[in-house]
């Protein structure tokens, strides 16, 4: 009840052009404890005082204007459900998607997350039909050029170069620098999963449930995919030799499936 009333009030603001529900609540994989991810697309960001006036009607806790990643209001509805409200300029968002899908820009991990967010959001309000047009425009297979760019860029980050993550992780183990081991291993996995999703022409679902998503949707996975991940996690802080061996196996098996798929990774 509170959720519907909240977004309904935002929809009446003249600067708001579209509203969409993202995350697990946009699909079928959620329960009553799942948070709401609400995306409000605006010509200009509604004033904080206007947002507060709406939010205080429907929320029992509010953090207004957090900007750790995107501008957002993080709140708890009066029914106890957390809600993240993110404010975006639809033209800036469109350019971000265009840069990836049409200009084939690859990042250090998470390349197609925003594209995934667009495609898998449920539109609640779309005053001029712009958000639906954007969804329809980009509801296309992953272009070969984008797939190849993601794989090339992130494979070089995994291995084969002096700054590659596998080399950095080995050096961190040698220093007994476990903070660095943790940091570089996380970066390694960001690039590793970016390659896996690109190789399968899947958009990247984001930081949650990546293993589950890959197992459910990817047609091509490296041999011992889950087993090697488990070995890495089990040994990261207890046995550096076994952790490095797990990384080596992950890289080798990933290279094999890339080669078998006929993808040019050079």
Predicted feature descriptions by range:
Residues 6-7, 51-53, 146-149:
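A short alpha-helix capping/helix-coil boundary motif
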Residues 4-8, 24-26, 70:
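A generic local structural motif
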Residues 1-20:
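Helical scaffold of the NTase/Pol beta-like nucleotidyltransferase catalytic core
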Residues 32-34, 96-99, 210:
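Short aromatic-enriched loop/helix-cap "lid" or pocket-rim segments at secondary-structure transitions
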Residues 59-172:
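Conserved NTP/Mg2+-binding pocket subregion across the NTase superfamily
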Residues 23-57, 72-88:
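Catalytic metal-binding acidic patch
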Residues 130-266:
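Conserved nucleotidyltransferase catalytic core and NTase-mimicking acidic/glycine-rich helix/loop elements
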Residues 26-27, 90-92, 202-204:
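Short, solvent-exposed loop/turn segments at secondary-structure junctions
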């Amino acid at each position: 009840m509170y959720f519907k009333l909240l977004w309904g009030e935002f929809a009446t603001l003249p600067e708001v052009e579209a509203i969409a529900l993202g995350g697990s609540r946009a699909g079928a994989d959620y329960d009553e404890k799942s948070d709401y991810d609400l995306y409000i697309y605006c010509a200009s960001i509604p004033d904080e005082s206007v947002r507060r006036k709406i939010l205080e009607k429907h929320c029992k806790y509010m953090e207004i204007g957090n900007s750790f990643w995107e501008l957002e209001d993080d709140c708890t509805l009066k029914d106890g459900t957390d809600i993240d409200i993110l404010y975006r300029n639809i033209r800036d968002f469109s350019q971000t998607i265009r840069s990836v899908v049409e200009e084939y820009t690859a990042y250090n991990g998470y390349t197609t997350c925003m594209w995934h967010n667009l495609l898998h959001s449920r539109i609640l309000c779309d005053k001029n039909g712009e958000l639906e047009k954007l969804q329809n425009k980009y509801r296309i297979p992953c272009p070969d050029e984008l797939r190849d760019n993601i794989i090339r860029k992130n494979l070089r980050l995994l291995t084969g170069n002096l700054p590659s993550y596998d080399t950095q992780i080995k050096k961190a183990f040698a220093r007994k620098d476990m903070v660095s081991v943790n940091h570089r291993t996380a970066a390694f996995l960001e690039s590793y999963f970016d390659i896996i999703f690109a190789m399968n022409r899947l958009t990247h679902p984001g930081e949650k449930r990546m293993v589950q998503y890959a197992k459910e949707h990817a047609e091509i996975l490296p041999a011992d995919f889950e087993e090697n991940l488990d070995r890495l996690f089990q040994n990261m802080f207890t046995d550096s030799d076994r952790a490095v061996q797990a990384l080596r196996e992950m890289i080798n098996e990933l290279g094999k499936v890339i080669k078998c798929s006929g993808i040019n990774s050079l």
